[in-house]
Structures are given as C-alpha cells and as structure tokens.
C-alpha cells in the first residue's frame, strides 16, 4: 500500500517464534494437529469477518489460538468469541491463557472453554482453545496428530 508513496522499502526476514508456538511449547503439544490463529482486533478487520472466521474454525474443529484477545477499549470481543466457539464445542474442551510468553514472569492459566474467565486476559495474553480431540495430560495440553478410532 505504501510502495507508490515511499518506494520499495528494504526487507530483512528474521526467523523467529510466534506467540502461538511459544505458548504451545509452554503448554505441551496443543498444536499437534490442525490449528489456526485468529486476531480478535477489529481495528483493521471488520468484526463480522472475525466472527465468520471463528465459526469456520469451530466448524472445522481446529485448535484456535486467539491473538489480541482484549484491550482496555475492546472488551466484548473475547466473550463473544468464547460464546461462538462454545456453541460448537463441549464446555470441558481444554483451554489456556498464556500471558507474557517468553518473558520473565510469564503466566499460564490452564482451564476449560466453559470456565475461561475473560477478566484474566489482557492484550499480552494468547488464548488457546483445544479441538474435540485435545486433552489435558497432567499439566500438558495435547492434541494428538491423528484421529484414532473410538475405543483405541
């Protein structure tokens, strides 16, 4: 968008770790199968588009990492996102809030979709909602790589 006004800026690619993968490393292996990341910030993306993406992720049974879940002025997005996901998932679906991941004093809240408290989330948090096959194994959130037949 800025190229016509400013020309081609120099670009350097630096490999790194996203907040979602850093949070996943802290949690165990929640991203072991299909997953997606969705930003709840409606500053540049209209809220109806974000809601459609949340519904699609829930219908596709993806593990969902929620970026930009809450700020001082954006308070309704996370409760609405949890309601949309909760309409399509069991309330006992594993969920977690990882705040300040990779920084000193990082905090982890292990919970379920039905018990996740939006008041414990801020702009420095990443929220991870498991899929139908995600489980807690002790302190570890695990999403197996394959769908095993029931009873195996």
Stretches found by the model and what they are:
Residues 1-60:
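Class I SAM-dependent methyltransferase SAM-binding "motif I" and its flanking Rossmann-like core
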Residues 59-152:
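A contiguous loop/helix-start segment that scaffolds small-molecule binding in enzyme catalytic cores
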């Amino acid at each position: 968008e800025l190229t016509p006004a400013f020309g081609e800026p120099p670009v350097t690619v630096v490999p790194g770790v996203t907040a979602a993968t850093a949070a996943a490393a802290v949690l165990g292996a929640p991203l072991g199968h299909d997953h997606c990341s969705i930003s709840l910030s409606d500053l540049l993306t209209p809220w109806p588009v974000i809601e459609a993406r949340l519904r699609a992720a829930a219908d596709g049974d993806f593990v969902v990492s929620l970026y930009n879940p809450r700020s001082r002025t954006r308070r309704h997005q996370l409760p609405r996102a949890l309601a949309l996901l909760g309409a399509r998932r069991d309330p006992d679906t594993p969920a977690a809030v990882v705040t300040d991941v990779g920084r000193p004093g990082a905090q982890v809240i292990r919970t379920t979709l039905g018990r996740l408290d939006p008041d414990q989330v801020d702009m420095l948090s990443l929220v991870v909602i498991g899929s139908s096959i995600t489980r807690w194994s002790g302190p570890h959130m695990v999403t197996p790589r394959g769908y095993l037949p029931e009873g195996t």
